[in-house]
Amino acid sequence: MRIITALILALCLGSGFVNADDIKRRRDGDKVEMVKLPAGAVQLFVEMDRIDSHHNIKRTFHTAQKHPANPVIGAVKPWEDRRSTWGSVIYDDKERVFKAWYGGQSGQKKEYMPGHLADCSVLCYATSTDGIHWERPNLGMHKVFGTKENNVVISDDHHNGLAHWESIALDPLETKPERRYKALGWSSFDWNGPMSGIYSMTSPDGLHWTHTPEPVFRYHPRSGKNDLGPVGDAQSLMIDTLRRRYLAFLRILPDRAFSSSNDFVTWTRPVASLKARAGEAGNTIYNHMGFVYGDRYLGQLTYLHQKDPAKTLVDIWLISSNDGEQWNRPETGRPLIEVGDIGEWDRFNVRHTGSPPIRVGDKLYFYYRNTANRHSPYVGKDNTQIGGGIGLATLRVDGFASVAAGYDGGQVTTKPFRFEGRNLHVNAVANSGRLTVEVLDESGKPLPGFSRESCLVMKADSVNHLVRWQNDVQLEKFKDRPIRLRFHLENVRLYSYTIH
């Protein structure tokens, strides 16, 4: 038994990849549950748990590139607060328009807690046909700064403090027109009281909103509603189209939690979802959000760097999940969206919006928000209150992480899986290299007609390249049996693969 285990270990080491759990299962004779890939479910390299081995491969996580027109939504009106501390941007396929909601202030002040006056917040609305150039419709709904000629949707001095909205979503699961839009909003007008916390809201058009009469998650620590403690003011909403449910991600220091609902009315008690690592300060994991990607989940984590009060910054990192509930923090080595450099508008404090990325052509649009100032506990003088707004950063479709090899060649081999669909497509940069794919049986032997030599070489830069073999054979013939894929890369960067 020891000799067999050692042989398996040697073979895995020779391939350049070792999965200790797989070795233990093989040694103990355990059966590993085989994945069945739905048709069209893109497979990324953010996690490597569906990869069996790789050789001479480098994996890289990629940072989104900021648009030169940033901020695409800046503070140009008196009520558009320079600190856009929350926001959401969606694309309405039916109306073929981008829609944005973002924070501002009404010019009024209110006592949030005894002896503490603060600006009353507003929620602003804008639209765009290209996601870059935005218009502010004159809604005439609320009087702020002495006028109703504005784009204000919600004013918290008229809505029980409900203008602090982290996420607004257009719900593809909803059948009732009056509930097409959904949101979670924070109110703190009853500070430390039973009415302070997170409310759920619905709307037919994203402009006229109805909220629950009391919080669905309370701030007050003695409310008895939250097992893990009082919720904070950094929440987000995910519509889980894979499992047809709603997930609320909540701030319960020092960790993050989730709660689920099937009807957006009744919610489960919060359960820990994303835990702080050893040595991290209690406020470090500031916020997170999630979205469906393929047959799995990705998300963004707003991370507060506060160990050194003289260098306090906030940036955005990639996270991932298999079930939407428990989240992983891949060792990416770099943020998904970085803070800006000296001279740039977003130097100190970038945070994700409450919305998933939007595909536009061959790119993903990530909208992020920048509050002009540094977050506490910053103690230095390099700070400002000038700037802020909503920015745009773009990433290649599926371009979160890639595997690559030089001209000396490398290989990536998947674990066995079943699938639905007919054809294999890849997202890769191979215009100065060679990419070929062979199809193997469960034991690792090439299947007739699908060898490396039979594969037509890819020499292109494409986000959706159809992999073909001689005689135009299709993968469909193997849909009832387990297969593996082996990718051969020569000066190639591979981002994803999908069976359609």
Language-model-derived ranges and their functions:
Residues 1-4:
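Positively charged n-region of N-terminal signal peptides that target proteins for export
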Residues 6-16:
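Bacterial N-terminal signal peptides
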